[in-house]
From Swiss-Prot:
GO terms for molecular function: structural constituent of ribosome. It comes from the Bacteria. PANTHER family: MITOCHONDRIAL 28S RIBOSOMAL PROTEIN S21 (PTHR21109), SMALL RIBOSOMAL SUBUNIT PROTEIN BS21 (PTHR21109:SF22). One of its GO terms (biological process) is translation. The keyword Ribosomal protein applies. This is Small ribosomal subunit protein bS21. Coiled coil: none annotated. One of its GO terms (cellular component) is ribonucleoprotein complex.
Length: 56
């Protein structure tokens, strides 16, 4: 879990910007979106192979 402590003389907007950057850097939001709904293992494998094919 990401924590952001508001510094002295720092606006809430700046602290929120730092927090959002930290969350996106750790990939927390993407992980939540990925796990929002159950995905069968066969579907997961299919998506993984399609992504690999798309990268090449």
């Amino acid at each position: 879990m990401s924590k952001t402590i508001v510094r002295k003389n720092e606006s809430i907007d700046d602290a929120l910007r730092r927090f959002k950057r930290a969350v996106s850097k750790t990939g927390t939001l993407q992980e939540v979106r990925k796990r929002e709904f159950y995905e069968k293992p066969s579907v997961r494998r299919k998506k993984k192979s399609e992504a690999a094919r798309k990268r090449k």
